[in-house]
Amino acid sequence: MASGWFYMSCMVLGSLGSMCILFTTYWMQYWRGGFAWDGTVLMFNWHPVLMVSGMVVLYGAASLVYRLPASWVGPKLPWKVLHAALHLLAFTVTVVGLTAVFGFHNHSKITHLYSLHSWLGITTVALFACQWFLGFAVFLLPWASQWLRSLLKPVHVFFGACILSLSIASVISGINEKLFFVLKNATRPYSSLPGEAVFANSTGILVVSFGLLVLYILLASSWRRPDPGALTDRQVWLLVSHYRWDKAKKACFAPC
């Protein structure tokens, strides 16, 4: 039962993450005119898509690498590399998303970083950068002692959850801000809840749902990578279920 709930949560998470990206892309394509890289508002349209993809979906996926039962046994280094690489990919996508909005603001002579959304977003990205470099230096490079890693691990996990929470808050405030900007025409104000508002609000609900599920899996003690010799009953069941599934796959695809 525990194993089934874990893998069902992973499937739901994958579906929610894909829907977050697809819904944001469709919103920008269908209601906001599509995409370009020319300094116009079409360049801005890359910003929400890339920020949702990087700071929410990829970041969330990278955060859960150590929750996979396959990562609980054997060498930890490959999983550390995967964890760092996915976060680096998320950060790269985020930087491109920031480039899009700053490029649009420069082209349109719009002031940078004046709204609460922008303050929250840039703070989140700065924390993400610090978190990645600290994690790379302490947990991936071999110089740090086990004592230092044990000391900083709870801090690393705490700020990881904080950054995801701030990312969700940034996305929600960004969706709201965008709708207030574009739905101020008297013929279709935001308060009349036109189709675009319903769709964008629904996208925000998807982002919140994705983030809450990531945080639930991230903070559930029975799904954390166990310390050596400290497996709980639920973790043992997850490991056994994982290897049964792996053995069944090998048997199915073995040459006759």
UniProtKB/Swiss-Prot annotation:
Residue numbers on the Cytoplasmic membrane side: 1-3, 62-83, 141-154, 224-256
Domain of life: Eukaryota
Pfam assignment, any one: Cytochrom_B561
Binding site for heme b 1: H47, H112, L113, Y114, S115, H117, E177
Subunit-structure text: Homodimer.
Annotated EC: 7.2.1.3
Single GO cellular component term: late endosome membrane
Membrane topology: Multi-pass membrane protein
Membrane-crossing residue ranges in chain numbering: 4-24, 41-61, 84-104, 120-140, 155-175, 203-223
Catalytic function, reaction form: Fe(3+)(out) + L-ascorbate(in) = monodehydro-L-ascorbate radical(in) + Fe(2+)(out) + H(+)
Function in brief: Transmembrane reductase that uses ascorbate as an electron donor in the cytoplasm and transfers electrons across membranes to reduce iron cations Fe(3+) into Fe(2+) in the lumen of the late endosome and lysosome. Reduced iron can then be extruded from the late endosome and lysosome to the cytoplasm by divalent metal-specific transporters. It is therefore most probably involved in endosomal and lysosomal cellular iron homeostasis.
Glycan attachment points: N106
Chain positions recorded as L-ascorbate binding sites: K76, K80, R149
Binding site for heme b 2: R67, H83, H156, R224
Organism taxonomic ancestry: Eukaryota, Metazoa, Chordata, Craniata, Vertebrata
Compartment annotation: Late endosome membrane; Lysosome membrane
Protein name, as recorded: Lysosomal membrane ascorbate-dependent ferrireductase CYB561A3
GO MF term list: metal ion binding; oxidoreductase activity; transmembrane ascorbate ferrireductase activity
Major place of residence: membrane
Cofactor comment text: Binds 2 heme b groups non-covalently.
Post-translational modification: N-glycosylated.
Cross-referenced InterPro entries: CYB561/CYBRD1-like, Cyt_b561/ferric_Rdtase_TM
Lumenal compartment spans: 25-40, 105-119, 176-202
Domain Cytochrome b561: 12-219
Keyword list, A-Z: Electron transport, Endosome, Glycoprotein, Heme, Iron, Lysosome, Membrane, Metal-binding, Oxidoreductase, Translocase, Transmembrane, Transmembrane helix, Transport
Cofactor annotation: heme b
One biological process term in Gene Ontology: intracellular iron ion homeostasis
